[in-house]
Amino acid sequence: MAPPQAPVQPPKRRRIGVLTSGGDAPGMNGVVRAVVRMAIHSDCEAFAVYEGYEGLVNGGDMIRQLHWEDVRGWLSRGGTLIGSARCMTFRERPGRLRAAKNMVLRGIDALVVCGGDGSLTGADVFRSEWPGLLKELVETGELTEEQVKPYQILNIVGLVGSIDNDMSGTDATIGCYSSLTRICDAVDDVFDTAFSHQRGFVIEVMGRHCGWLALMSAISTGADWLFVPEMPPKDGWEDDMCAIITKNRKERGKRRTIVIVAEGAQDRHLNKISSSKIKDILTERLNLDTRVTVLGHTQRGGAACAYDRWLSTLQGVEAVRAVLDMKPEAPSPVITIRENKILRMPLMDAVQHTKTVTKHIQNKEFAEAMALRDSEFKEYHFSYINTSTPDHPKLLLPENKRMRIGIIHVGAPAGGMNQATRAAVAYCLTRGHTPLAIHNGFPGLCRHYDDTPICSVREVAWQESDAWVNEGGSDIGTNRGLPGDDLATTAKSFKKFGFDALFVVGGFEAFTAVSQLRQAREKYPEFKIPMTVLPATISNNVPGTEYSLGSDTCLNTLIDFCDAIRQSASSSRRRVFVIETQGGKSGYIATTAGLSVGAVAVYIPEEGIDIKMLARDIDFLRDNFARDKGANRAGKIILRNECASSTYTTQVVADMIKEEAKGRFESRAAVPGHFQQGGKPSPMDRIRALRMATKCMLHLESYAGKSADEIAADELSASVIGIKGSQVLFSPMGGETGLEATETDWARRRPKTEFWLELQDTVNILSGRASVNNATWSCYENA
């Protein structure tokens, strides 16, 4: 029998396959969409392998070419639309032999695999066997020499799609933050019934051998106790747990009790700690009415959150670039993220480290297992311990190291402000410091610092701050007032309350406030104290950081709004919605939201708007709708930052599109306004608030016992904590190389260099806008 016919010469365009394997995770559809569109943009062809490795083994109609329009609307869909399965056949060589044959027949010699460590290991084994598989296919007559000759090299690129976030070498896996969102939503809902009946709840979350979901949900919800596989409790944990819960309820007046347990939790002797066992202990020892809630597969479902949408998109784009960059001898890469930076690392290094963690746990080598988790995991665990056990005698500092720390919010409200304050208060109480909340910003301080019996500066009790764990906005009040309006009164109030340090949470106004205080130190020695800014603003425009608290909450709120608007646009078929985003003169929110919702175009202040740009976009829309005859999901979204242009307002842009459409399609304007500030903070803003606030407290604490002149001489005594690339660091505000002099665009209230600007190109590529012509989309270019 003659072997099946396949192209003797390789196809003109390179063919890249994409598959999703293992357990499904929100964001997998974003990967497929990004790979397909980036491949087409790079003059390649994209093929989807349906049902994971099973589709690769069976071939035929389970390997299909996908075109640009086929993946429209996929970003907002949960699960994986190309299917996933755990394929036992592929684990055996005969199965991989069939898979190799099917790939050659389809002309595919590159594969992007999105799955867990097992799926990625299988992909790397497949690549290592590839030459031998082709040789065997020729020897057995399944294929000819001519058929296999163009496909001697197989390129594999891995993407980690897993809700467990159990892969070493990356801060986050695709789907983990969406899963964390489901958990936090569930626990937030449990709060009300737990409070009403003074009940305890034991909540079991997924994660297998990794405690990331359990740890982050415990931080996000202020859980009283936590069980994770990497750090089993010491013997006698039952007594310790009961003691903490009793103290929280009887001494601190806490009405609800939450215990988070990972499904793989065990003690130091590897005995499983089940949720039912914990419930029995609380019921029998404390006589506490306790319920067990096993969240199960609800943690996998639903649409991807904002973070997983843009992460899957950027990693999918990077995967195609990695395929095109790969050399034959190079190891297969896996695409990872460290803080805000997309990176590549050898796939098998990451897999091996991940498996080593599991082995250490099985060998009771828990310190080694913890050491192999990324530094972020260890920092979060440290922060949780230091903020969940106040008054612990082992953690208290000596009297001469204790400080009076002022805490103030400056600027517009942002998700995470309350959580940062809660973390700071809890850390202060744990270490013996005195946390002093300054209510209603600097104007509140100056007007009411001398009031009686209640003034604007008050000590914060643990009971008060603990209630802020999932509250949005700012409970101590915030506004845009600056100390420069009345420096003398500000200094007088600082002296009255004896502030030893100042913790400022807020946006560009907070940055400006600390700058004013720093510059006034010579005239007012009261300001010769350590001061640090924790950026919190939906605009994400604070110099010294690539991430601000509140920006993720804003993004999630905005994509929910856009998803609903897109549904309306698609139902009306030929309709464009122009949506106005906030963000001041920074286009961060508009750009990242555009990436997360698949916007056709994004207008930002950094690029501006002019008539030529609008004309090109209207032509682009006209061509799109002309090709879309009879297509589903045909609604379009354009995002416009509120300050992109003073002339071309959101309504004007919508009206121009409608006028130029000549009845072929229509447009509407939508302005979500302050809705974008969000309600409850997102889990990412909650956990980063804890981590960053704890780091700020450690930084301020390091100045205890130093003289005023020593503090003023240290450039880091007035600083901003921020994420830069793959690092979290403090940057000095003053000095020749400080943020004020080198990185701040004071006129536009944003950093001089904005890391996210290159994302505009990705938005344009994935919308098809970039391929219209090679002209720049910025009306400021060459101006």
UniProtKB/Swiss-Prot annotation:
Gene3D superfamilies: 3.40.50.450, Phosphofructokinase domain
Region called N-terminal catalytic PFK domain 1, residue ranges: 1-389
UniProt similarity note: Belongs to the phosphofructokinase type A (PFKA) family. ATP-dependent PFK group I subfamily. Eukaryotic two domain clade 'E' sub-subfamily.
Reactions it catalyzes: beta-D-fructose 6-phosphate + ATP = beta-D-fructose 1,6-bisphosphate + ADP + H(+)
Binding partners and assembly: Homotetramer.
Main location: cytoplasm
Activity regulation (record text): Allosterically activated by ADP, AMP, or fructose 2,6-bisphosphate, and allosterically inhibited by ATP or citrate.
Keyword terms of this UniProt record: Allosteric enzyme, ATP-binding, Cytoplasm, Glycolysis, Kinase, Magnesium, Metal-binding, Nucleotide-binding, Transferase
Pathway: Carbohydrate degradation; glycolysis; D-glyceraldehyde 3-phosphate and glycerone phosphate from D-glucose: step 3/4
Active site (UniProt): D164 (proton acceptor)
UniProt GO molecular function: 6-phosphofructokinase activity; AMP binding; ATP binding; fructose-6-phosphate binding; identical protein binding; metal ion binding; monosaccharide binding
InterPro entries: 6-Pfructokinase_euk, ATP_PFK, Phosphofructokinase_CS, Phosphofructokinase_dom, PKF_sf
Chain intervals for the UniProt region annotation (Interdomain linker): 390-403
Gene: pfkA
Sequence ranges of Pro residues compositional bias: 1-10
Residues the entry annotates as binding ATP: G23, R86, C87, G116, D117, G118, S119
Class of the enzyme per the UniProt entry, highest EC level: transferase
GO BP terms: canonical glycolysis; fructose 1,6-bisphosphate metabolic process; fructose 6-phosphate metabolic process
UniProt: substrate binding residues: S162, I163, D164, R199, M206, G207, R208, E263, R291, H297, T298, Q299, R300
Keyword Transcription regulation: no
Residues covered by region (Disordered): 1-20
NCBIfam families tied to this protein: 6PF1K_euk
Protein name as catalogued: ATP-dependent 6-phosphofructokinase
